[in-house]
C-alpha cells in the first residue's frame, strides 16, 4: 500500500487529499476493506484527524463516490473546437486511459454493488449520470445544428441515451479485457456506431 504524504494545506485541500486516499484504498481493498484505519494509514494521518473532516465512514464513502463521478469521465468542458471534433474527442476521451483503466474498473465495481441498496449513493449516482448525459446531449445538439439537421430536444435526448449506452458497454469491455483489443480500437468502433446512429460523419478515426 502506497502512503500519501499528508501536508499542511487549506481545509478544502486537506479534505480533498483524504477523499483521494479513500478512493485509493477502495480501489485496492474494496468498500469493506476500506476501513477508517486503512484510509488513515494510506493518507498518513490519524483516524482522529479523519473524523475531524468526516462524521462517519458512510459520509467518507459518499463524498468519495461524488468525487469519483465528477472525475470519472471526461466532461464537455474538457474539449474545445468545432461541434463535430468536440463530440468525437469527447467519445474518445471516455474510452481511453485514464478514464478506462484498472483503477476506474475497481472503483466502479466497488460502488455499483452498493448503489441499489444505499439511497444516498443512488442519489449521487443519478446526479452523476444525468450530468454526463446532459453534457452528451448538448454536444449532440450542437453537432446536429452545425450540420443543418433537426435538433429537437427529445430526439437529442434519445441519441444521448443510446450513445451513452455504447460508451458504457465498450468502456466495460476495454477495462475487463483491454489486452484483447488494439490501441484505440474500441474508440474507433464507438465512433463508427455513433455515426451510423446519427447518419453523419464525425471525421477521421
PLM features per residue range, with description:
Residues 54, 96, 110-117:
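Short helix-capping/turn signature of helix-turn-helix
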Residues 73, 77-78, 100-109, 119-146, ...:
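Amphipathic alpha-helical packing segments from all-alpha helical-bundle domains
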Residues 17, 21-59, 63:
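Helix-turn-helix
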Residues 1-13, 201-205:
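N-terminal intrinsically disordered/low-complexity leader segments
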Residues 63, 74-104, 156-163, 205:
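Hydrophobic alpha-helical connector segments
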Residues 66-71:
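Short, basic, alpha-helical segments at the C-terminal edge of helix-turn-helix-like DNA-binding modules
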Residues 120-126, 146-205:
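Hydrophobic/aromatic-rich alpha-helical bundle segments in the mid-to-C-terminal region
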